[in-house]
């Protein structure tokens, strides 16, 4: 199993990450589609080749073709939106917030899977990319759809652990050169 290979690659000094990776994926209360879509979208957002290579096959095996594509779409559109909306939020001039975005985001309206799943994946990617405005927006949509805070936090835990594993393994690869 690729998850076991990924866990075994984590150095001893990051044992907490190894344990957390096993628990957030192996013991998650999220339904399979939500879990593996979150895993795939976050593996992409982590920008870690090792993490993506190890987690993608299992994600693909646990997702329908539509969900697999939608999770990749969530990572792609959030890569754009998180930069755009984080910048608008951080700029001191509030007038930027009144300007039309002018960016295509059609996939958000028609992701090819349940809207709640896509929103959850988008929220998790937004956590990795650090866009508070996007986090708030996706959290509000999820809460209005009846998603509880525990489910939202579970997706954020998956995001945080995958990101930390990616940073750790990529740093170790560089230091080993």
Curated annotation (Swiss-Prot):
Record keywords: Antioxidant, Disulfide bond, Oxidoreductase, Peroxidase, Redox-active center
Keyword Cytoplasm on entry: no
Active site: 131, 134
One Gene Ontology term of the molecular function aspect: hydroperoxide reductase activity
Disulfide bonds: 131-134
Catalytic function, reaction form: N(6)-[(R)-dihydrolipoyl]-L-lysyl-[lipoyl-carrier protein] + a hydroperoxide = N(6)-[(R)-lipoyl]-L-lysyl-[lipoyl-carrier protein] + an alcohol + H2O
InterPro entries xref list: AhpD, AhpD-like, AhpD_core, CMD-like
Enzyme category, top tier: oxidoreductase
Source taxon at top rank: Bacteria
Family statement drawn from the similarity comment of this UniProt entry: Belongs to the AhpD family.
Function (record text): Antioxidant protein with alkyl hydroperoxidase activity. Required for the reduction of the AhpC active site cysteine residues and for the regeneration of the AhpC enzyme activity.
The protein's name in its UniProt record: Alkyl hydroperoxide reductase AhpD
Organism: Streptomyces griseus subsp. griseus (strain JCM 4626 / CBS 651.72 / NBRC 13350 / KCC S-0626 / ISP 5235)
Lineage: Bacteria, Bacillati, Actinomycetota, Actinomycetes, Kitasatosporales
